[in-house]
Amino acid sequence: MAKKNMIQREIKRSKLAKKYYLKRLAIKDQLKEAGSFSDKMDLRQNSKEMPRNSAAVRGRNRCWLTGRSRGYYRDFGLSRHVFREMSHECLLPGVTKSSW
């Protein structure tokens, strides 16, 4: 189980990313249309003034059950440990153990 403060930090980052999403998108669009170098530098400075954690890239995928960040299966939102346990208990529909 991940530390509670790490999970809370990720929640805070996702909220900030949602809050500043449209503002970041507008700055990116303006950067594409900007012609002069000084305009681009001004727009980049505007993006740097936003909080660092408001960038969606800084978020990390975590298991919704344990909060583990490594060994994460994107399709299920689970870490590999929980995925294995739940699949053995037949709690994940359509998941079967392979045999060949």
Swiss-Prot record:
Transmembrane segments: none annotated. Part of the 30S ribosomal subunit. GO terms for cellular component: chloroplast; small ribosomal subunit. Coiled coil: none annotated. This is Small ribosomal subunit protein uS14c. It comes from Pyropia yezoensis (Susabi-nori). The lineage of its organism: Eukaryota, Rhodophyta, Bangiophyceae, Bangiales, Bangiaceae. GO terms for molecular function: rRNA binding; structural constituent of ribosome. It is found in: Plastid, Chloroplast. Keywords: Chloroplast, Plastid, Ribonucleoprotein, Ribosomal protein, RNA-binding, rRNA-binding. Gene3D superfamilies: 1.10.287.1480. SUPFAM superfamilies: Glucocorticoid receptor-like (DNA-binding domain).
